[in-house]
Amino acid sequence: MTTQKSMKFEQFNDGIVTICEIDDDGNVGTRKEKLRFTEKTVGYNRYYEAMTAKVQIDKLIRVPHRNWLTTEYLAVIGSDVYEIHQVQTLSETLPKTTALSLHLTRQRRLNNGKF
């Protein structure tokens, strides 16, 4: 007998993240796409596992799934620039969702301080 997985409907109502390419100087380059997101809590285990790997996770968000979305992009929320440290596809949600582990960076910046 097969059982059906329960699907969770994901809402993206916490804000908008802009996914951008990285320019030649390592800063925010060409805007790829704006996506709505929902923010999740960075759990105790995830936080300390990241710290033991010498990676700091400042924010965990979920966005609608995009096949092209990798760690080769930057995420901009408001005026804050984040490096994408992990991209994880969640198939048990409707619609299909991608979880992004983000690190707030102070070395990277917006070109001319704005979009």
Tell me what each language-model feature is:
Residues 1-26:
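Active-site-proximal polar cores
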Residues 24-115:
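Short, conserved turn/kink motifs that form compact alpha/beta structural patches or helix kinks used as
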